[in-house]
């Protein structure tokens, strides 16, 4: 191994004195390598104009160019003279024309109530009854209301919605959920030959809705659009008798203290108190019959739980009934002589929720007195699972393509709610 010569050793030693570590490499400490090398430069100090009482600052506004020893002028905000939606600036909340001191708690399409049905019952002053009304169940059990070759036609609808309609291998929920409801409604409409009074109905989509009411010291509002609403020329007949309605006076609404009843509702100070049924005056089908609320979110975190979906169904059915009651009987809070009945069906394309609401009173401020009534039939499976591809094990088809564990009773209830009021 050759030894370094004298001049070479002196050069290496000289590099050490220069801070190169003795071998030509830069010498830095850990602090210099770690923090200082990644630290961003300090931001430029803000241009500040110091206002001294009695003295006017001398700026370079009249010079039309920057002068370093003169103060920076303060220019008024530039006005375009026209509204550009890309750069629109809303006025402060307290300066807007619809601003009000009293907050309004709003329920809309994407509100998910923490307490679910229990919270919705308190907000709407409603008594819950499990199961569908006897009048509706009698339509379910009556074989004369069944459709010819009913089960096979429902199976074809499921296969069409989940498999045949889409070009995807596995269609998403937002694709098959609305399709299966529309096809089931189309199948129900085939009964118009047997029951001509079904011709006095029509369906509408994306109907706007807004209604406001006071509950104790709270101002509540439901507003939004409904997926599909079936409306009719004639209202649904009352379900509960006058004696059953008067018996609700003794019912005590369940509370959920210490949780606030307005939790998960949107608190808003800019709002408009109005009643909107979604239909113009003179519309030939003014009475709401059935709301079809779809849960078609693909991502699981965005989906409603079954309890939250039933609460949403109750609030939107209640809002439609309340808006209709005020349209017919005025805004005076009182017990209705002719209760208003509105139905609702909620589904994710597989599990169905059925609900029937009877609005008995518009006096909702106090928890005493007559209560409204709601009947629910929860978590009714139309089918357990749908195989979009066959399951093959050892070259044997274990599970063929199609629905698994089909429940025909669920469609019978769906059909009974559709026929209610026409049979």
Swiss-Prot record:
Domain of life: Eukaryota
Keyword Ribonucleoprotein: yes
Compartments, record wording: Mitochondrion
Pfam families per record: PDCD9
Similarity comment text for this entry: Belongs to the mitochondrion-specific ribosomal protein mL37 family.
Keyword annotations of the record: Mitochondrion, Ribonucleoprotein, Ribosomal protein, Transit peptide
Transit peptide: 1-29
Major localization listed first in the record, in broad terms: mitochondrion
Subunit structure: Component of the mitochondrial ribosome large subunit (39S) which comprises a 16S rRNA and about 50 distinct proteins.
One GO molecular-function entry: structural constituent of ribosome
UniProt lineage: Eukaryota, Metazoa, Chordata, Craniata, Vertebrata
Listed GO CC annotations: mitochondrial large ribosomal subunit; mitochondrion
GO biological process, one term: translation
Gene name linked to the record: Mrpl37
UniProt keyword Lipoprotein present: no
Protein name: Large ribosomal subunit protein mL37
Residues spanning the membrane: none
